[in-house]
Regions:
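N-terminal flexible/basic segments that precede or flank functional cores
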Residues: 1-44, 104-113
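The alpha-helix within a helix-turn-helix
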Residues: 46, 57, 86
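Core residues of bacterial helix-turn-helix
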Residues: 49, 60, 88-89
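Short alpha-helical "recognition helix" segments of helix-turn-helix
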Residues: 52-59, 67
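Helix-turn-helix DNA-binding elements, focusing on the entry/boundary residues of the two helices
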Residues: 53, 64, 79-82
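Recognition helix of helix-turn-helix/homeodomain-like DNA-binding domains
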Residues: 61-76
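DNA major-groove recognition helix of helix-turn-helix/homeodomain DNA-binding modules
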Residues: 80-95
Length: 113
């Protein structure tokens, strides 16, 4: 799956601990935080539903190796993969802004004019 910009896979930014619960580097990009939160959500979803990599692959059409790579932070999944996983579980896995570390909001566009 192609990556945008020069971001590394999410796991690249893990400092210590066990993925996906490891602390991320201070300079980890947004994609790493989202990837980590997605992996946590996927882990919880699989645990709560009893799915294995293979049963989830059968239910979604996503290969078990791709699901494993998403769960292990070794790939940035594409939208189609996320959509198929969410459809199989019946709930949202994509974390949204809640995955981001606390930061100052961006100034409004009118503030810089």
């Amino acid at each position: 799956m192609p990556r945008s910009s020069n971001d590394q896979v999410p796991r690249h930014y893990a400092l210590d601990g066990t993925w996906p619960h490891a602390a991320l580097a201070d300079d980890a990009p947004v994609s790493a935080h989202y990837g980590q939160a997605l992996a946590r959500n996927l882990e919880r979803a699989m645990s709560s539903t009893g799915h294995t990599l293979r049963t989830l692959a059968d239910a979604t059409g996503v290969t078990h190796s791709t699901i494993s790579r998403v769960a292990n932070g070794r790939v940035m999944p594409d939208l189609g993969t996320i959509a198929r996983l969410e459809a199989a579980f019946g709930f949202q896995l994509w974390p949204g802004p809640a995955a981001l570390p606390p930061a100052s909001p961006l100034p409004s566009a009118s503030a810089s004019v």
